Amino acid sequence: MNARRRLWSLLMLILAVGTAATLTIMALRRNLTYLYMPSEVLRGDTAQQTHFRLGGIVEKGSFQRTSGTLHTRFIVTDGNARLQVRYARILPDLFREGQAVVATGQMQHGIFIAENILARHNETYTPRTLTNKMQPTPTQHTHLDTPIAQTTP
């Protein structure tokens, strides 16, 4: 009887772990958002109505804003392909033409409708205010021609 009880407990444990693993995998698959470049999207690597992230560079001269609204349009490129993006929310402060961007959304009729925009920058980014503070002003000396005299109290 004791061996039968252990076998039953082991089977229940295996069933519980299997169920938990299946539910976890299903939840993760539903929440995964893949990153694609414009050339991959136009090649058809994504399904038409699925959510995904679009990464690339905002093409210079492509940014347009509808006056009086938050609606914007711009083109994201990876150097090989171009894809039009529409966005209807406030853009991040770092958003600029010629800079990297990651947009989350879905394709609709050949246009990427973004729900979220992340402006990316490289590791050498320095805020403008910090750059201005780091530049020497006319009253600052960039080097000393003479040694500093020591003062004694």
Swiss-Prot record:
Entry binding sites for heme: H121, Y125
**In UniProt terms, what function does this protein have?**
Heme chaperone required for the biogenesis of c-type cytochromes. Transiently binds heme delivered by CcmC and transfers the heme to apo-cytochromes in a process facilitated by CcmF and CcmH.
One of the record's GO molecular function terms: metal ion binding
Q: Which organism is it from?
A: Xylella fastidiosa (strain 9a5c)
Does Transmembrane helix appear among the keywords?
yes
Sorted alphabetically, which InterPro entries does this protein's record hold?
CcmE, CcmE-like_sf, NA-bd_OB-fold
Q: Tell me how this protein sits in the membrane.
A: Single-pass type II membrane protein
Q: Which gene encodes it?
A: ccmE
User: By what name is this protein known?
Assistant: Cytochrome c-type biogenesis protein CcmE
